[in-house]
């Protein structure tokens, strides 16, 4: 089982900040995940929601703001909102999972991926139009289709587009989905798995899955510490 630090290490530090990403990387996780939106002037920045209310108490939306405006914001606990470029620099050679939240595939995302084409970056999104477009334009990139409600439809989309895998809310996971993914060699990523018993159960019964967790240090200790 592979362990992905969710939004860096969301349970240990403010999500999608440089501080959180560094904790996720230091935990020993196999990959560190963060979310990106593209600004009005084409710069991908880290944020989960469309606006900054949750992070910074600001109701303005990412795509309505310039990067210069966003650089002035601070999270509720005083941290900076990083650009995706800053995030990749901070993570060094740590493998990355970049969740694209935009409504379309922006030039800023393509430019970022091209600049870092030698990095181990996987791209995921719940917006399947973005993924189909990315598959056409950058076919070598490892792509994952996210879904909130429709895993069967998403698996058919994955097979049709010949992309790598699916990210799924763990509550929708079941043995049928596992066997389908195993049969068709579809990577399966589950989020967000935090409880120790759940991590150990999935590792024992469904070892092919990977998990996003807010506590990557905990998951690494549970699964990889000497018995």
Stretch-by-stretch model annotation:
Residues 1-227:
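Phosphate-group recognition and catalysis centered on beta-loop-alpha active-site segments
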């Amino acid at each position: 089982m592979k362990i992905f630090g969710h939004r860096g290490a969301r349970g240990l530090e403010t999500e999608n900040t440089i501080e959180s990403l560094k904790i996720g990387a230091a935990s020993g996780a196999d990959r560190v995940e963060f979310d990106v939106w593209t600004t009005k002037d084409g710069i991908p920045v880290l944020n989960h929601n469309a606006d900054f209310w949750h992070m910074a108490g600001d109701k303005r939306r990412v795509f309505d703001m310039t990067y210069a405006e966003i650089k002035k914001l601070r999270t509720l606990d005083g941290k900076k909102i990083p650009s995706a470029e800053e995030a990749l620099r901070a993570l060094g050679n740590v493998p990355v999972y970049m969740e694209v939240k935009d409504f379309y595939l922006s030039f800023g995302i393509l430019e970022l991926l091209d600049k870092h084409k030698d990095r181990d970056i996987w791209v995921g999104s719940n917006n399947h139009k973005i993924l189909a477009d990315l598959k056409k334009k950058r076919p070598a990139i490892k792509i994952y289709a996210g879904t909130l409600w429709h895993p069967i439809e998403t698996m058919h989309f994955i097979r049709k587009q010949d992309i790598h895998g699916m990210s799924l809310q763990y509550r929708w996971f079941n043995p049928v989905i596992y066997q389908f993914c195993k049969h068709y060699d579809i990577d399966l990523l589950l989020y967000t798995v935090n409880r120790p018993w759940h991590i150990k159960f999935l590792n024992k019964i469904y070892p092919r899955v990977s998990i996003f967790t807010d506590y990557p240090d905990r998951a690494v200790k549970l699964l990889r510490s000497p018995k």
